[in-house]
Amino acid sequence: MAGDKGGGDGERRLRQPIVVVLGHVDHGKTTLLDKIRRTAVAAKEAGGITQHIGASIVPADVIEKIAEPLKKVIPVKLVIPGLLFIDTPGHELFSNLRRRGGSVADFAILVVDIMEGFKPQTYEALELLKERRVPFLIAANKIDRIPGWKPNPDAPFIETIRRQDPKVREILEQRVYEIVGKMYEAGLPAELFTRIKDFRRKIAIVPVSARTGEGIPELLAVLAGLTQTYLKERLRYAEGPAKGVVLEVKEMQGFGTVVDAVIYDGVLKKEDIIVVGGREGPIVTRVRALLMPAPLQDIRSREARFVQVDRVYAAAGVRIAAPGLDDVIAGSPIYAAESEEEARKLMEAVQREIEELRFRTENIGVVVKADTLGTLEALVEALRRRGVPVRLADIGPVSRSDVLDAAVTRKIDPYLGVVLAFNVKVLPEAEEEASRAGVKIFRESMIYKLIEDYEEWVKKEKEAERLKALNSLIRPGKFRILPGYVFRRSDPAIVGVEVLGGVIRPGYPVMDSQGRELGRIMAIKDRDRSLEEARLGAAVAVSIQGRILIGRHANEGDILYTNVPAQHAYKILTEFKDLVSKDELDVLREIAEIKRRAADHEYNKVLLRLKIKRVSQ
């Protein structure tokens, strides 16, 4: 048998809370989990830890022993049998701990580097936790990195902080205050755990060092206390058939395809009928073996040994061997059934649940492919929060048909006609089709980075599109004919000029300071090199074709302007003002004043529209 039932068979028991660790890359998630395990092993005379598949149970008596120095400050008398920590930290694993309407995880530790503060994945973790309605505390990690910190290995935080210099305590206070501020901005009140009177109203911040072990006693004490106080109903153990979620699908010598699962409710027994989600629909099979790690070993090792058990009780991490598991999808629900009839009903429920996550519509939207149901759900949720519609969401490699779907969208909306591939391969024929159809494929193994890359691309594409639209207009330019640099007087006039503001380009019409049109710029040269444009400060030669005769219509030293049409001026001021330089705007104001004095009716209409717009704003 495996899993702690937590009491006699006749009573309503509490199971272990399932705890997951989240946070930004390199903020110390894995180190913290390792430290918790090592701290528990060090207290082995009280029972050590129980290793599960993908999880470790720290028993209640071990937590009480570790937290013993705090008994006067944080009295810890546990009624839960312990804490089940999911061994693999991170958002992708948390995403797979999914159940309909929430998460299998009962509680989370959000790890924040106290010196670095909030980072992109910290915000993503907050979004995920809010979306799945999972309570959490913050482990403000790496307190040993605070300048001047004097480490006290494995000491409680309330003891080690008293031994620090006032300046060090001041820095810690400041860093904690910054975390409180970021949480407030996210709409979540938080405070240092020692100052909280009602833990239902504020999220606890526990300063720790995963490296030295400082603060770990408080972290475990607060975590255990919070879960058993506020999650008691959720943690009530049910004796019925098991409910769980698939974390991983893998091959195992002697057993073929097996699944690693977390059982969060009920009992799973050898020979039970189980229903689990597959690529082509629900799979019904019978448990052949339940496998747990042999004690005193690192189960992450390839040589790890396993023992068979007859049953497991929630909460537990277990490896399940059964026929027909090849097509199981990670992140899918797994249910035990007491009869064939119940299995049929569960098949319908599993099918409905998977169809909600794997879908194809005729709507305009991005194509999303992911490796598991959990990451697919998390990715689609994250996109929807950002207002990005999804046309297709599915599991598995990117295929040619996925690219064709994106190509259909691209014709209508080029910013949505893309494929977002999370942790999956792109098939060669899909690569070829994407190249042919001009469909962009984004690939990443971190959800936040995948969305960030896509959003950055959209931003750049839209900026490029706006710049293209701006450059289709005649833009403001001001230049002076340099004395002594008249190379040809007319047809076309060729003169040396200095650009005094804005931009001049071939094709732009030219006017004088009275608003009279003189011709059109044919070419701009710097020595023998043709230029596409010249800006403020440039000294270049220009050729002007039209009714201009140097000496009659314009003279050496005269200032000329580009002749910006009224509608172009309006667009520049209303749509592209952020893309043009200050000197260009100054030149446009001069041009508008020249046009006003020349009684240009079109310009006067534009000026009136702009005035009305400013007043209405």
Swiss-Prot record:
UniProt keyword Oxidoreductase, yes or no: no
Region spans: G3: 87-90
Binding site for GTP: 23-30, 87-91, 141-144
Pfam families with a match to the protein in the record: GTP_EFTU, GTP_EFTU_D2, GTP_EFTU_D4, IF-2
Function: Function in general translation initiation by promoting the binding of the formylmethionine-tRNA to ribosomes. Seems to function along with eIF-2.
Residue ranges occupied by any tr-type G domain in the UniProt entry: 14-231
Segments for region (G1): 23-30
Gene (UniProt): infB
Record protein name field: Probable translation initiation factor IF-2
Span list, region G5: 209-211
Keyword terms: GTP-binding, Initiation factor, Nucleotide-binding, Protein biosynthesis
UniProt family annotation: Belongs to the TRAFAC class translation factor GTPase superfamily. Classic translation factor GTPase family. IF-2 subfamily.
